[in-house]
């Protein structure tokens, strides 16, 4: 099975002003929404160097959760051990200033409790042929 990566999935929502950023004011700008989470990023990066990692994690039981799974599948990440659960993903909302620095951010952490049950039930299967684990 090679490398097993265990961890959280986040959706990063990033706002960038089109003109001078006004703290506390209304700012026109562009907004990006990307899949994130350090562990998810690591699994995708490992796959990008043509290794075939297994990702063990949680996603929301929504279309966005399915999008995360689909993108990892497209990168040839084994997604068999990703569970869809309510509140399975975190969210990071960040506002950047004109210099590209984070001016404000709010982070909602996911409930990772279901990972314990998944590892108790399928841990032997997940790790039996693994060479390395990244948490």
Regions found by a protein language model. Give the residues of each.
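Glycine-rich phosphate/adenosyl-contacting loop at the front of the ribokinase-like
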Residues: 1-56, 65-67
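Structural motif
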Residues: 2, 131-132
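Conserved N-terminal subdomain of the carbohydrate kinase-like
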Residues: 23-26, 48-131
């Amino acid at each position: 099975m090679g490398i097993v990566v265990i961890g959280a999935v986040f959706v990063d929502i990033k706002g960038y002003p089109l003109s001078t950023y006004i703290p506390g004011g209304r700012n026109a700008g562009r907004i990006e929404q990307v899949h994130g989470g350090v562990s998810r990023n690591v699994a995708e990066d490992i796959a990008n160097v043509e290794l075939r990692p297994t990702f063990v994690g949680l996603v929301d039981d929504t279309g966005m959760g399915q999008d995360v799974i689909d993108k990892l599948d497209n990168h040839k990440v084994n997604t068999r051990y990703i569970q869809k659960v309510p509140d399975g993903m975190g969210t990071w909302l960040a506002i950047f200033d004109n210099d590209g620095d984070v001016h404000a951010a709010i982070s909602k952490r996911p409930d990772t409790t279901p990972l314990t049950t998944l590892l108790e039930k399928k841990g032997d299967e997940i790790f039996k042929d693994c060479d390395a684990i990244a948490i």
